[in-house]
Regions:
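N-terminal glycine-rich anion-binding loop in soluble enzyme alpha/beta folds
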Residues: 8-72
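Short secondary-structure transition/capping motifs
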Residues: 41, 62-69, 88-96, 120, ...
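Generic beta-sheet signal
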Residues: 7, 84-86, 232-234
Length: 283
């Protein structure tokens, strides 16, 4: 159990929630809003991935996302918990982190003295999920608020995110690939293997002809970049392509020892950016 000290974790909705978190009052998802074809879709437990992908396919415009307001974060932080943590999308990719900081400042003016810490994941999707798992592990071990922050900051500094997408257009059209040097023509069926930089931007690591070869190359990149892998939990999220996720899981298990592998479906924001057929990994 979590002992007497009451904790709260707030994760923006780009971060996939584990099934047990969905039923746990210690966890709350703060929703981003998705806009597709003039319709606003709240990325909460009502999100319907199949319906969303259908709408994206039918819409001539590229979908967009809007981050939660500072007031929404303020409301989430305004609770009786002794320790409150937020885990946001990379500040390089979204305004969610800044919104959370503003929300904390607003609450501090009205009700000073709360212990609230906001982690910039420098990642997205299941990168945020793994950070949430690390916070939970530290809290369950009885760490002080300061020690949790220190340990999780270290974890974030050592975490890497990787992805292979069938379709990079949503990222590209929303300006999320502006820092990427070498993107290749999709006409050649070349699929880039993408990754995260230390600051939380997106970079290209490799490429292959066809998505299955790209997944195998990604597995190689992950094995190469992961130290002490036998002590680490690796997470995979996929957008409507379970068989690809399993292909990748098997490739990873052949290449490296891991403590555990978690496989989740992408929620709303991750589905929007990964697109149908995309696979994301964090470790």
């Amino acid at each position: 159990g979590l002992g007497d000290v009451y904790k709260r974790q707030i994760i923006d909705s780009c971060g996939e929630l584990l099934d047990e978190w969905k039923k746990d009052e210690h966890f709350e998802s703060v929703a981003l809003t998705l806009n597709v074809g003039g319709e606003s879709i709240i990325d909460d437990e009502t999100f319907d991935q199949a319906d969303f992908l259908k709408k994206v396919a039918a819409s001539p415009e590229c979908p967009k996302s809007a981050c939660p307001s500072p007031e929404r974060y303020m409301k989430a932080f305004d609770c009786d918990a002794d320790h409150i943590y937020a885990v946001t999308l990379s500040a390089e990719l979204s305004g969610s982190y800044n919104s959370a900081v503003l929300g904390r400042n607003l609450l501090e003016e009205e009700k000073p003295g709360r212990k609230i810490h906001i982690f910039n994941s420098k990642s997205a999707s299941i990168g945020q999920t793994l950070i949430g798992m690390k916070i939970q592990e530290c809290e369950e071990a009885g760490y002080s608020f300061e020690k949790v922050i220190e340990t999780v900051d270290e974890y974030i500094a050592g975490q890497h995110t990787f992805f292979v997408l069938d379709n990079l257009e949503t990222l590209r059209k929303n300006g999320r690939l502006s820092k990427v040097k070498a993107l290749v023509a999709s006409a050649l069926k070349i699929k880039p293997v993408m990754g995260s930089t230390d600051e939380g931007n997106i970079c290209q690591l490799d490429q292959a002809r066809g998505i299955n070869k790209a997944l195998v190359k990604m597995a190689g990149q992950i094995a190469e970049k992961t130290q002490n892998s036998e002590e680490k939990v690796l997470a995979i999220s996929h957008c409507n392509c379970h068989e690809r996720a399993i292909l990748l899981k098997n490739a990873l298990q052949e290449k490296m020892p891991l403590k555990n592998i978690v496989v989740l479906d992408t929620a709303g924001v991750s589905s929007m950016y990964a697109n149908d057929g995309g696979v994301i990994v964090a470790v």
